Amino acid sequence: MESGTEEYELNGDLRPGSPGSPDALPPRWGLRNRPINVNHYANKKSAAESMLDIALLMANASQLKAVVEQGNDFAFFVPLVVLISISLVLQIGVGVLLIFLVKYDLNNPAKHAKLDFLNNLATGLVFIIVVVNIFITAFGVQKPVMDVAPRQ
């Protein structure tokens, strides 16, 4: 076995700059040398927002069902039905708005003002939805507890 100027390790050659050597550059995920596609990023962002919107829509539908099951005897029946209905309508509106945002080309400078307005509108509506849902939670939506033990 010859011992030259090369450095050998159990797993092979560790020349400077070779993969695995201490001075090698860390591997990059994907191709970061190309410019970011703004449309692709916006579409992913809108898809994620839409999924969260659907989850909240399902939660509000479940809350509405629980309130209706409690009936008119519940102290906060009317306010909760109104707040949940407002939240549901706003969520559907934001969902439609997100669909329109995905359809527009972000690389077209002529549409930037309109897209900026629609994006700000969606953000404002999401803020209102959050505030409405805070009030829904504050009024408390829970199913009535049935007494298991007989009363005497």
Curated annotation (Swiss-Prot):
Positions glycosylated per UniProt: 60
Species assigned in the record: Mus musculus (Mouse)
Q: Family assignment?
A: Belongs to the ninjurin family.
Q: Where is this region: N-terminal adhesion motif?
A: 26-37
**Which residues does the annotated region (Helix alpha2) include?**
58-74
Q: Where is this region: Helix alpha1?
A: 44-55
The UniProt keyword set, sorted, is: Acetylation, Angiogenesis, Behavior, Cell adhesion, Cell membrane, Cytolysis, Glycoprotein, Inflammatory response, Membrane, Phosphoprotein, Secreted, Synapse, Transmembrane, Transmembrane helix
Q: Which residues carry this modification: N-acetylmethionine?
A: 1
Q: Where is this region: Disordered?
A: 1-29
- Gene encoding the protein: Ninj1
A Pfam family annotated for this chain is Ninjurin
Q: What induces it?
A: By nerve injury. Expression is activated by p53/TP53.
Which Gene Ontology BP terms does the record give?
angiogenesis; cell adhesion; cellular hyperosmotic response; cytolysis; ferroptosis; heterotypic cell-cell adhesion; hyaloid vascular plexus regression; inflammatory response
What happens without the gene? Answer: No visible phenotype in most cases. Some mice have dome-shaped heads and die within 2 months after birth. Mice show abnormal behavior, reminiscent of obsessive-compulsive disorder: mice exhibit compulsive grooming-induced hair loss and self-made lesions as well as increased anxiety-like behaviors. Mice are prone to systemic chronic inflammation in the skin, liver, kidney and pancreas. During inflammation, reduced motility of bone marrow-derived macrophages and protrusive membrane dynamics are observed.
List the PANTHER family. Answer: NINJURIN-1, NINJURIN-RELATED
Which protein, by its recorded name, is this? Ninjurin-1
